[in-house]
């Protein structure tokens, strides 16, 4: 992606005011005659103008969602109309009912690439959900993200087996 989460996220949102920057980024990207596809991932369906530009100008459709199976499938069905390859650049949030066992089989069936950004529990603290107060740093019973503990053992052997079976 040339631009992650156009419109902003977290504490401050630029919203549709990010459109001129997004347009410039694609112009700059095209001027170097890239050998790789250009994209900017859709992430907030309320940003209508940004999404329209992203979807019309991306060589491959990238998106992210942390929603569960049904919502994720609806988003895929919407994005299919662009007739381009798709990559889900962020997904899987156990605390939001978005799990490897639910989402990965659907992505495989739909022939959609997937990027999992959390791998090993560590300094990024992605075992904890975003914007969640941490009274202490005790390991939560339900991790938000990540697959392995820092010693290399899996958080869930069932998840690891699911991932292995789907990626062979």
Annotated model-derived regions:
Residues 1-157, 162:
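Extracellular glycoside hydrolase catalytic/binding regions
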Residues 163-168:
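Non-catalytic accessory regions flanking glycosidase/transglycosidase catalytic cores in CAZymes
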